Amino acid sequence: MKDKILIWLQSTLAKSISFIVLATSIAVAQEPDTEEATTEASVEEVIVYGIRQSLETALAEKRAKANLTEIINADDIGKLPDENVAEVLENIPGVQIDRSAGIGSDVSVRGSNQNRIEINGRSTTPSGVNRGGISFSDLPASLVRSLNVIKVPTAVMVEGSLGGTIDVKTYRGLKLEKPLRVVRVVSEYAENADQWNENFSATLGNKFSTERGDVGAIMSLSHFDKFVREDRLRVSPGVRQAADSQIDFDGDGLGDPYYRPGFGDLEYGLENRVNTAFSGSLEWQVKDDLKLYAEASYTDLNKQSRRQSMFLGTPASDLELDGAADGTYGVVEVAGYDVPMLTSGIIGGGIRNGRTDLSTDVDDPNDGIQLRSNNRAGNRDTQSYVAALGGEWDRDNLNIVFEVSAAGSDTVETAFVSVFQFNNPDAANFHSANARIRVPFEYELDDDVLEYGPVAGAVTDAQLLDPNYWSMFVTKDQESTFDNEEFAEKVDVTWFLDHDVWRSLKVGVRASQRSINRSRQSQVTPNWPGFSAADLSSYLLASPGDFFDFNGGANYLDNFLTLDPQKIESQREELRDILALDATGINDPLQGFSVDEDTAAIYVRGDFETTLFGIPARGNIGVRGIYTDQKASGNEVFTDGTLRDVSYSQNYTEWLPSASLVLAPIDKVQIRFGYASIMRRPSFNDLSPTVQYPLNIGQAVNVGDPTLQPTKADQYDLALEYYFRKGSVLSLGYFYKDLEGVIGKETVPGGICNPRAVDANAGDPELARPTCVVDGLDGVIVTRISPVNLPGGTIEGLELSYQHVFRNLPEPFNGLGVIANYSYQDGSRDLTFSTPGFLAGEDEAQEFPLNFVGLSEKSYNFTLFYEKRKYSARIRYTYRDSFLVSESVDVSNGQPLYTHDRGQLNASMSYNLNDTFAITLNGVNLLKERKVQPGVFANGPIARMSDSDRRISVGIRARF
């Protein structure tokens, strides 16, 4: 592989140099005549204090850059209750975030969540098998000096983003003018979890003068231990087909199809997150022209899941339910087609419609919802690091930067799930599926609130909390290990030119060696191993009993029993022994895979400064050539039932040109033009040749494709910026992205045999899934989901930004400032999705439009701040439109899942006791907005609904 890379480097060097020479020959050669030429080099790295100063320095840095970059500086970060990098980023135009358990977890930049996360310009590695880099939730905001979101890349930047590159800048010591010592202690109350959480951070740095040159040292520490709780309700949209329907919507005398509740579950989502993070930098100015440096960052995140869940099955009857005519129904219009859905009714009322073909061993012929409780005990333990050694040599008109770096992450994820079924304790066959007690449920959709709970009198809390009613159905024990690693070497050479147009020429090479390995231990008890909850009474835990208390008058199933997730984690080996599971776990070759990926890049960029038609102009033009060599290895079950090691290799070369131009027609106005060819390689999970068999029969089997090609796009930018006062700006930008293709999901119902899934209805002639055999193991035929290269499309948008500090207002209003951002994005995709034929008629499928994942049409944020010498305050409201979460997810029967539009209000205040100490008060999710996720269509039936904490914190900050 390395020989291929060396040959490629030799063959492409001449091409890259030729590109820049050609660009030089067509440039306009005139001297610049601007009075103040602002360049990137003119803005030094400084430590800033206060909201106003941080905004001013960030804006000056943005203005100086030739390529479009959004910047947020340290005190701007610290003045809001932002916990991690994702939450900081939602202040930026064109950026939207999503939250998990109320904490920022996913970021979309200009309609794409396929971004690249760097620390000081270097690669980071994820906790799992995705691309992009370190998880946003793993990187605390307290380590950050500044955040750069590069929307238009240059040739010297590492490829890998379709949205933007997010570069996290940490502190460095050589440019400190005085010692830096900042300590922050915060105590936070989480409302749903009803817990006080602790947060500590500190940054210490200094510059020392020695006989052998100046030395700058700085380090930042962060630690938090917090509980969060997000309760979730899931009700998958099911289908009542026309042949089984008794509801006539169009008056033709025939039953019509509609959406109705399918499988579901509810969950008390308690988590304990402990994060310890460190970053440090050591710089040595050996000589005036030579600097050496060493930098490192490290995070250690432990996320303990203490969730309790109740699985809600579907009624047994495949005919129309009793009382359906008494229900209420609604119709939504999608792409000109009317889609009917049930909006309220009793699900599973009566005696299975008076059927006489039930087997005689069914103890409870009443129809209704099957109840299965389970714990969600699991940990994610991740250690991530980034380290670099390098130097910078300045010699006359030559600058050389050389560096070696390493990034890695080691993750262990555990999951121990015990499932109990709500059964009749008096049944002779108590430990069996047929002893189940079915409970009719009330279903009601009311705007953006979903209600789903047992009919009054159908079941009592005393029964649900009696361990004698619960029979263990199955226990699943799983442990996954992820090892991510990347090594990189680069040399950048910059010539500063004595030329009328070209100011510098940068040439560089970079090589990287990337690997990811996943291994998994997996074991499962037989169905109905013969334990009741009473047999494991010392491990039991009752649910909190306050599910979705925000909706006080609604009906939900609040009370039930599960095994205690915390005890399971601490006594896992003991439980394995009780349940006759292997004490150390069993390696599952069908769940492991590895990907090795080597890259080599060569790049050339020319920076120019001139005039065009008498207008001062500056910018850059360049090209990046990148060679990729991949090998994906894993295991595969062939048609003859044998298990074999498999590996697939591929390589490809891409050329990525880019250019930026900044015009300054008058002193306070800039016009930006940008172009870049960008690419994103498939996620490692998508490249896996190993078939991933989940234990849950309701989940599809994911099958990777090691021949997937990268996604490529061309993007164009135009922006007008008016810097009307220091620290103030009004800007309007337009962007357009033309995607050659995207990687999406293809769903094939009944497309694969899963030998790991357990069918709860095995033996039931009505409900059991079709069976199969693979590798000598009995299995169940389930849905297959595979990644595929899908047609592309276009994304275009407008970004409007306004920032202003009011300086001449009368007291007490002097000190007010405002930041407002608005984004509009429009996606046009060369792909639709088909609903099953029940919507359009017999054996027909209806086509509906499908947008890009993570793209919200409209989003905005508005921040009002007030700063005086003694105190400051901020309040920020953010909003984003609905967006597509996934083209194909199990919760909506292999059809799309959306997130509804949502806003959030955060606020912060601080009061300076003296020059050293300040008291802080912060609030997050003050309006306690719920997350609502429709299935199938953006305005379809609610498939998921969740409620996360409102968090209030008090703290003290010291700066010495």
Question: How would you label these PLM feature ranges?
Answer:
Residues 47-78, 122-127:
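N-terminal periplasmic "start-of-domain" segments of outer-membrane beta-barrel proteins
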Residues 86-124:
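Extracytoplasmic beta-strand/coil segments of soluble accessory domains associated
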Residues 124-151, 202:
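Short acidic/polar hinge/loop motifs at secondary-structure boundaries
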Residues 380-384, 591-597, 679-739, 760-766, ...:
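Outer-membrane beta-barrel signature, preferentially recognizing the C-terminal barrel domain
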Residues 736-738, 748, 756-887, 927:
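Gram-negative outer-membrane beta-barrel transporters
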